[in-house]
């Protein structure tokens, strides 16, 4: 499934009926491969940056607290991960079938939980559950939804932090920070 060739496709808007199964197959293959050249350990750098961030709110503090509670369980660093898996980097055809992934600059060895942190924003929690079920059947380790939920909260905090510190990214809409703030309330209704 992974061949490194140029592919046609559009950014993920609406996944097709086979998309989740196709993504599970692709990620299982990638995570068992040896394509990465280095261990960048981006997950821990994001966490360290958030710890140092002076403007973090209680949502971020709580996410960091929960992350520290599972930190020892996230030390698996020998899976080859894409590292930036979100809608803009997932290509699909007209029927919503997975065509491939793009933007491989974050390719490294790391914990597979990190890979799943943002995808639920487009496939929903039920889609994530199905993806994890299909993925976990194919690998020798287990990715836990609870850990992915914590990492998703960390990713939301990180997205807000980088935009507040550096400004909006080139692909952002003008209300990007507001959208991430809303994501906290919609995705995590028990918070604030």
Predicted regions and their residues:
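ATP-binding pocket architecture of kinase catalytic cores
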Residues: 1-38
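Active-site catalytic-loop/activation-segment of kinase and kinase-like phosphoryl-transfer enzymes
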Residues: 2, 25, 36-75, 79
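Inter-domain helical "communication" segments and dimerization helices
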Residues: 4, 20, 34-45, 134, ...
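A general structural signal marking secondary-structure boundaries and capping sites
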Residues: 10, 30-38, 71, 139, ...
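An acidic site on a long C-lobe helix of protein kinase domains
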Residues: 19-22, 84, 112, 149, ...
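Structured catalytic cores of enzymes that bind and process phosphorylated ligands/cofactors
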Residues: 31, 78-80, 148
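Active-site acidic catalytic loop and adjacent metal/ATP-binding pocket
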Residues: 68-116
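Helix-rich C-terminal or lid/interface subdomains of diverse kinases
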Residues: 118-192
């Amino acid at each position: 499934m992974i061949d490194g060739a140029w592919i046609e496709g559009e950014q993920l808007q609406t996944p097709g009926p086979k998309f989740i199964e196709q993504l599970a197959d692709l990620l299982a293959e990638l995570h068992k491969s040896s394509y990465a050249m280095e261990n960048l350990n981006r997950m821990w750098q994001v966490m360290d940056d958030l710890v140092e961030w002076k403007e973090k709110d209680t949502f971020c503090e709580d996410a960091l607290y929960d992350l520290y509670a599972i930190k020892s369980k996230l030390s698996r660093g020998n899976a080859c991960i894409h590292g930036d898996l979100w809608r803009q980097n997932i290509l699909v055809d007209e029927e919503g079938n997975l065509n491939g992934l793009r933007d491989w600059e974050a390719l490294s060895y790391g914990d597979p939980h990190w890979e799943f942190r943002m995808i639920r924003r487009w496939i929903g929690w039920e889609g994530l559950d199905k993806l994890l079920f299909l993925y976990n059947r194919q690998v020798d380790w287990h990715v836990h939804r609870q850990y992915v939920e914590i990492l998703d909260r960390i990713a939301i905090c990180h997205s807000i932090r980088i935009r507040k510190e550096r400004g909006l990214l080139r692909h952002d809409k003008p209300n990007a920070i507001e959208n991430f703030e809303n994501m906290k309330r919609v995705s995590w209704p028990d918070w604030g």
